[in-house]
Amino acid sequence: MSFNRAIPKLPPQFRGKWNQKTYHVLRELGRGANGAVYLVSQDGVRRAVKIGAEGMDILMEVHALKSVQQGRDARVTVAPLLCDVDDLYIDGRSCTFYAMEYLDGERLDQFVQRTGTDWVPVLIIQLLARLAVLHQRGWVFGDLKPENVIVTRADSQVRLIDFGGVTKHGCAVRQFTEEYDRAAWHAGDRRAEPAYDLFSLAVMTVRLASSPEVWKSSRTEPRQTSLLCDIIRNNDSLYPFRVPLIKAFHGQYAGAEEMKSDMLAIVQGRTTAVQQKKASGSGSSGIWIGGLFVASMLLLAGTLYYAWMM
């Protein structure tokens, strides 16, 4: 989707009209269809500030962020902590912005490219836990893609970072990317419902676990989910998860919790199989054996904890 040229540019320093907090702009972090995000300093603390062309769009994001932070639980942190909402004047025009916790992390696809595809199931399970909270609050993320998800550097946890596409259940999705859009794949409409997010997540899983060459081959017209199924069938990392992925393609999950349970069961089964193989002394080969397997399981232990506690 094209960028909105009407998005105002933040001045090097500004103060909120109502709350009177002063911000020093350090650099622009990113720009999307309905807003731009800047890294700022406020009283010596780094924050991320988002400003958009339309105040109503910004306020809808604020509403969603406040909603998922109700009863905020450290076990499942869905989104950055909202810190401030205010107005400022830019070139004589009143503009709404919000400041949030700055998350130091790596984009999801870049993290997988650096660490390997063995991490994909663990990260997807984490993401499902976060989507479950969002859906329980009556929202759909909408524009789910690797660019809108980061893995934090401090603890390798998945976080959603761009709420520009969040939409109330039952409405038309406000923002989407065709590559992950259910309608573009001729698999449904753009009605905001949990199944819409789960379809996008399944497509994203296939992309993350595939080579660039294989993924490029799927981007033909017309898009059909049968192409994605072919990739899964021929991919050793994806094949064990074929049932939940295909169910997500066909809208057969009532919610993220159900898909998360299926993914967890598969990971647990593979973990048990690896442990039995190692105990029998039958060798140490296989994609889930070795240092990365251990690291993945340590990360999964944290994922399982809050997954079971929810």
What residues fall within each predicted segment?
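Conserved short submotifs of the Hanks-type protein kinase catalytic core
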Residues: 91-107
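ATP-binding glycine-rich loop module of kinase domains
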Residues: 22, 26, 33-64
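C-terminal single-pass membrane-anchor helix
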Residues: 271-310
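C-lobe/activation-segment region of protein kinase-like
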Residues: 159, 164-232, 238-242
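Catalytic-loop of the protein kinase fold
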Residues: 134-152
